[in-house]
Each structure stands twice: as structure tokens, then as C-alpha cells.
């Protein structure tokens, strides 16, 4: 598991508890905390501590035939991560956005995209939180660019054994584009406090994106189909002392990481807009403001929606 934060750490703990042999690759204070005390997973049912092998880099791992690497870092870190892996290893992209798979396929033959519906958080070294119960999430998988060949079924079976809903899908990228639409609000939801006006901005971001995807001929699920897909599996519940925080972008600001995923979420829409000649000023504005906040290490909710909108017309 390359990246042991909210998603990677939670999945690694659940896979380990289900009997899979798991190793985590992490860094910084989180790495040191896990080396000292293991990984603490908090869920609505209670908490559990997991003694999992943890490493600071792929070169420290004793790679063996049959190993699979699961990428669980933010997309801005993917290229460096891929270059550090041994040749020929199957790569599972447990990540938001739709850019990671193309990056991975340039270097690796077997690439397995996962559409991640897994509400988690990670704000404290050595601790990850999974908020949905009894099913922790949905992790459908496929083979990139399409199909379910290779190890997709075996990986889905491992996810199911760990409690997830997971099935191989030949159209997995259709679902990853659907998830991309959901994630377009991450930036403004991280930057601005909750309000009706904030939700109106999210609607604009998604409307703009749907127009671009339609022009590009890229398929995605409609809102009703997407709601039905998630409804019977994702059930976020309270955890004592651990209120549900925000998205992965919100958590990046809260931890002061200095980076954020907006270039590969809102920026994906901007890229397609430029390729197909469609203006995307709402998503470009979200991308710029998110990067500015991350670089300045601004706190979540530090921008009002009035400030967000007042600078929108400055986007060329």
C-alpha cells in the first residue's frame, strides 16, 4: 500500500485484518508513529490497532513475485511514486481523478483503476478513520483502459473479504469520471464555510464539467444512477471524538501539507475544455484558489463565498 493516509491506511488495516499480507509505505511523522505503535483504525464499531510492516520507500521493501502495489497518494505525487517502483509490478490506482491510470500505463503493463467511494480521514500521525458502517465503502475495479482481464476479480475478492462492496467493471473509467464530477466541489468546500451560495458554486462547477465531458464524448453516470449506486452501501455514522471532517482537499489544508489535488480534479475539466475549445472559468478559478490556499497553508474555511465570487471575473 503506497500511501498510508486516510484511504491507504484504512484499506491496509482492513485488508490485514482479513488475512491479507500487507505492507505500508509512508513518510514523516505518520511513518514514525506507525513504526512505534502500529496503525490505529477508528470506525463506528470501535477502534483497532494493527501491527503492519511499514516502510519509508519502495526500495526498503523485499518485493516478491505476486506482489501488487496499490497507489493511494494524491495525484500530484504519482509520477515520482511510479518511478520508484520495481518494473513489472501490477499497479492498482486507488485515487481520485482520471490522470493516474495514463501515467501508470506509460511505465507498467497491468494497471487496475478503482472507483473509490470510501469516506475516511487522516489528521493525526498513526491514526486513520473510516466513517461508513457496516460497509466501509465501495471499491469497484477494472483493467485500464477497459475490461476486467488479469487480476481484477482476484483484487475485488480481496476487497470483499475486507468488508467492501467490490466488483469488476469493464466500464470502470465511466465510474471514475462520475466520481470526478463528485470531487469537483472539493476545492470550494475546503476553502469556504458551508452556505447555500457555496452549494450554488458547486452546481456551476459540475454543470461546466458535464458540458465539457459531453463535448469530449466521455461517458459518466447521471445523478439518479449515481445515487442508486451508492445508496445501499455508504452510511456515514458518528465516531466518538472523531466528527466527519471534509474531503481529501479539506484534509490537505487542515494538515498544512502545502499541496492540493485541484490540478487533477478541477484541472482535468480545464484541460479538456482547452482541448475542445470550451470555456471553463469556474473550474479554473477553483483550481487557482485551491493552489493558492495550499501554498499559503491557509486553514480550511478561510475564504468567504463572496470573496470567491468577487475574483471570478479575473479569470481569463
What are these regions (language model features)?
Residues 1-47:
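NAD(P)+-binding Rossmann beta1-loop-alpha1 motif at the extreme N-terminus of oxidoreductases
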Residues 96-178, 185:
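Rossmann-fold dinucleotide-binding core
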Residues 173-212, 237-241, 245:
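Active-site-proximal catalytic alpha-helix in oxidoreductases
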Residues 203-316:
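NAD(P)-dependent Rossmann-like dehydrogenase/reductase catalytic/cofactor-binding core
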Residues 16, 105, 160, 214, ...:
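Anion (oxyanion) recognition and catalysis
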Residues 20, 39, 89, 109, ...:
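Short phosphate-binding/catalytic loops that engage adenosine nucleotides
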Residues 46-128:
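Rossmann-like NAD(P)(H) cofactor-binding subdomain of soluble oxidoreductases
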Amino acid at each position: 500500500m503506497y500511501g498510508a493516509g486516510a484511504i491507504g491506511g484504512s484499506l491496509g488495516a482492513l485488508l490485514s485484518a482479513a488475512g491479507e499480507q500487507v505492507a505500508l509505505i509512508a513518510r514523516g511523522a505518520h511513518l514514525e508513529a506507525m513504526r512505534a505503535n502500529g496503525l490505529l483504525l477508528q470506525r463506528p464499531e470501535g477502534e483497532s490497532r494493527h501491527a503492519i510492516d511499514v516502510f519509508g520507500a519502495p526500495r526498503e521493501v523485499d518485493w516478491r513475485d505476486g506482489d501488487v502495489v496499490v497507489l493511494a497518494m494524491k495525484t500530484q505525487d504519482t509520477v515520482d511514486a511510479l518511478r520508484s517502483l520495481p518494473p513489472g509490478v501490477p499497479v492498482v490506482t486507488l485515487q481520485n481523478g482520471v490522470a493516474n491510470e495514463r501515467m501508470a500505463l506509460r511505465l507498467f503493463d497491468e494497471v487496475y483503476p478503482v472507483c473509490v467511494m470510501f469516506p475516511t480521514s487522516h489528521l493525526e500521525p498513526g491514526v486513520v478513520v473510516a466513517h461508513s458502517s457496516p460497509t466501509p465503502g465501495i471499491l469497484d475495479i477494472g483493467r485500464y483502459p477497459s475490461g476486467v482481464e488479469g487480476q481484477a476479480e482476484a483484487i475485488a475478492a480481496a476487497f470483499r473479504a475486507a468488508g467492501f462492496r467490490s466488483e469488476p467493471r469493464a466500464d470502470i473509467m465511466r465510474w471514475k469520471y462520475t466520481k470526478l464530477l463528485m470531487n469537483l466541489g472539493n476545492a470550494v468546500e475546503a476553502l469556504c464555510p458551508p452556505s447555500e451560495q457555496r452549494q450554488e458554486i458547486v452546481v456551476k462547477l459540475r454543470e461546466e464539467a458535464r458540458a465539457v465531458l459531453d463535448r469530449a464524448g466521455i461517458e459518466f453516470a447521471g445523478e439518479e444512477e449515481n445515487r442508486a449506486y451508492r445508496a445501499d452501501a455508504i452510511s456515514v455514522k458518528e465516531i466518538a471524538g472523531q466528527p466527519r471532517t471534509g474531503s481529501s482537499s479539506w484534509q490537505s489544508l487542515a494538515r498544512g501539507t502545502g499541496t492540493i489535488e485541484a490540478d487533477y480534479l478541477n484541472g482535468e475539466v480545464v484541460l479538456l475544455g482547452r482541448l475542445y475549445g470550451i470555456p471553463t472559468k469556474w473550474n479554473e478559478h477553483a483550481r487557482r484558489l485551491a493552489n493558492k490556499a495550499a501554498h499559503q497553508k491557509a486553514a480550511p474555511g478561510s475564504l468567504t463565498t463572496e470573496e470567491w465570487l468577487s475574483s471570478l471575473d479575473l479569470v481569463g
